[in-house]
Regions:
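Extracytoplasmic thiol/disulfide redox context detector
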Residues: 1-10, 78, 83-86
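Local sequence-structure signature of Cys/Sec-based thiol-disulfide redox active-site neighborhoods
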Residues: 2-30
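Short active-site oxyanion
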Residues: 8-10, 33-35, 65-67
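Thiol-based oxidoreductase modules, predominantly thioredoxin-like and allied folds used
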Residues: 32-46
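Short polar/charged helix/loop
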Residues: 44-52, 78
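Structural micro-motif
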Residues: 52-61
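Non-catalytic, surface beta->alpha helical segment in thiol-disulfide oxidoreductase systems
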Residues: 63-87
Length: 87
């Protein structure tokens, strides 16, 4: 869990990251209202993502309940979204 508060699903990623593109595509396909934060366009966002996850890996997906996932598979992400009531 993270101490950061997000009103909706927030994903930290980068365009060059294959896992980021895959996770973002799943969020889009499921119709999840989410914010996408590009860590390349906003260098401070990379620091925020690392502070949340404790790792430098992306994507970092933060759920409104404070839970976060790092490099989730589609199945893991969809299960977390369902468990948190997002979908």
């Amino acid at each position: 869990m993270t101490d950061a508060t997000y009103d909706k699903v927030t994903m930290f990623g980068a365009d060059w990251c294959r896992d980021c593109r895959r996770s973002k595509a799943l969020l889009d396909r499921l119709g999840v209202d989410h914010d996408y934060v590009d860590v390349e366009a906003d260098p401070s966002a990379a620091d925020r993502a690392e502070a949340i996850s404790g790792r430098k890996n992306i994507p970092v997906v933060v759920l409104p309940d404070g839970r976060h996932l790092v490099e989730p598979s589609d199945a893991e992400l969809q299960a977390a979204l369902t468990a948190s009531g997002v979908v």
